[in-house]
Amino acid sequence: MTLIHWRVKTIFTVALAALPIFSWTGVAQTRGGPAPRPTTGSGPYKAVMEMDAGLPDHTVYRPEDMTALSGVTLPLVIWGNGACANAGNSFSNFLTDISSYGFLAIALGPIVERGAAGPAGPPAAPVPAAQPPIQQPTDTTHLPRNLPPAATHPSQIIDAIKWATGENDRAGSKFYKHVNVGKIAVMGQSCGGVQAIEVAADSRVTTAVIWNSGLFAQPSDMGGGKTLSKKDLESIHVPMAYISGDATDIAHNNANADFEYIKSIPVFRAWERGVGHGGTYNQPNGGEFAGIGVAWLNWQLKGDARAALMFRGADCGLCVNPKWVVRTKNLK
């Protein structure tokens, strides 16, 4: 097996390992979808997870009591799963926490019934030296397609945007006039991050956050959509953030290389020592990654200057945190 074949298979395998194990039986749908499933999150709005008959191939995370929003509108966050999995509850801890801070989050894929608890994730890596230089990826030859077809498609991100826009305009919808369709983030982990990159150039998108992911050095259709190359990054004109684990994260170098390639837009790159490709998503309330996600979204979608302090300036919150390594470009 060549190094490249091993690398592609490993990305797929590790991404799956980061997810809970499912029975993949699906959830029977009724008109309006199954009853919302109680979750919570650490934010001011108790969040729930549900499916909607108008968007059957997705999972919706929202504040439980929409009537209590009192004129508050929810920015929209669309999520692509690791391994491009067709399971919208595979990152439920993480997305519930984000929604609890006043966001409408929509994941690709329906709710599927959970089986046994997932694996604990990759072991902690040795702590690397402080502020190591960013290294380029070693995969410099063309990547063959060595994966089964992605179970979700980047077009489902656009479907979610259209659905949320329609529900915001539809009298009688619980989302009527409660969605800020002018503030939209696309995000995803691993393979789902590639899906987010593909649609980040859409004019409706406000920001993109790429988790444990990045494009390959050579063109690849890993996300199930079009074949993407680094040049596709030039079509993106909104602020981006790349968040990953350390060098044990199989996509660490991919994220580094994307950061180096991007020239003109604001881009934030950070990775956490001792964390691998599985991130902290399955920890209570999504762990530290969720807190970072909430802060970035509060800044980019709500204009929260206090949240910006986590990312902006030489003494930014993550910059002075010894667990994190940070690089930025054009970030103001």
Question: Which stretches of residues belong to each language-model region?
Answer:
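Alpha/beta-hydrolase-fold serine-hydrolase catalytic core, especially in secreted/extracellular enzymes
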Residues: I265, G274-G276, Q283-K332
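Short beta-strand element of the alpha/beta-hydrolase
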Residues: G71-G82
